[in-house]
């Protein structure tokens, strides 16, 4: 089972894809102008990822579930998740199960203008204890926020703030999610971007990509390379009942 995380910078023209169907452009015209460019960029990124991985020349039809989660109408196609952070667009895709992606810019987590800023989030006593022991508490808060939202986006219930439905135990590297039996999440804090990918039932392999419309795809360090980096801030969380060790082989 493979999982892919692709991202690109929302610069004019750089994420425009020729693989978008006319229906997608029509849908974009029906949303507010300030959201049109990022809508087309995210669909373009997904379309290019589907072409790279499967040779599918045009983005398949997407429908929206009742709680707002977009999915391919063809249930035989992979699960995907879309996220935005500043001028960056991200897409996660998994070949089996479901996935969720969330991203935050490092500087946004330190400012009042971010809708998911740490000051707007209530942490549990367990989470607060872990945060207090980290070298960069702001970054630690951002990691927990993105990790939580990636799991909620996986379940399709992103607005659910009930702690009984999702508990994070960062000291143990575990989580408890009431809606799925098996889930794993990976969260990394880079110099600019904090991101988290959650997958059911497990993350066996995660490839990281970057797309520039002018220069094409670029492969970024995968999770094993990141885990072996002495300065790595990567965290891996597994469902409480199915915890397994992370072996960078």
Swiss-Prot record:
InterPro entries reported in the protein's UniProt record: 4-PPantetheinyl_Trfase_dom_sf, P-Pant_transferase_sf
GO molecular function, one term: magnesium ion binding
Entry GO CC: cytosol
GO BP terms, alphabetized: lysine biosynthetic process via aminoadipic acid
Protein's recorded name: Uncharacterized protein YieE
Gene name in the database record: yieE
């Amino acid at each position: 089972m493979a999982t892919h995380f692709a991202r690109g910078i929302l610069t004019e023209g750089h994420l425009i894809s020729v693989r978008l169907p006319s229906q997608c452009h029509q849908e974009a015209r029906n949303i507010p102008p300030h959201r049109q460019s990022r809508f087309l960029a995210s669909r373009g990124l997904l379309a290019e990822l589907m072409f790279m991985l499967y040779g599918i020349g045009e983005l398949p039809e997407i429908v929206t579930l009742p709680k707002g989660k977009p999915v391919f109408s063809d249930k035989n196609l992979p699960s995907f998740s879309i996220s935005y952070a500043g001028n960056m667009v991200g897409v996660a895709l998994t070949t089996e199960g479901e996935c969720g992606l969330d991203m935050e810019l490092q500087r946004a987590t330190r400012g009042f203008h971010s809708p998911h800023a740490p000051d707007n989030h209530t942490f549990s006593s367990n989470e607060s204890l872990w945060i207090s022991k980290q070298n960069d508490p702001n970054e630690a808060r951002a990691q927990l926020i993105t990790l939580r939202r990636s799991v909620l986006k996986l379940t399709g219930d992103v607005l659910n703030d009930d702690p009984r439905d999702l508990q994070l135990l960062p000291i143990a590297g575990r989580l408890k999610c009431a809606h799925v039996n098996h889930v794993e999440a990976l969260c990394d804090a880079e110099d600019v971007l904090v991101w988290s990918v959650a997958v059911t039932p497990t993350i066996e392999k995660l490839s990281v990509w970057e797309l520039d419309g002018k220069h094409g795809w670029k492969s970024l360090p995968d999770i094993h390379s990141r885990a072996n980096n002495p300065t790595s801030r990567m965290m891996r969380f597994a469902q409480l009942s199915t915890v397994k060790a992370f072996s960078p082989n």
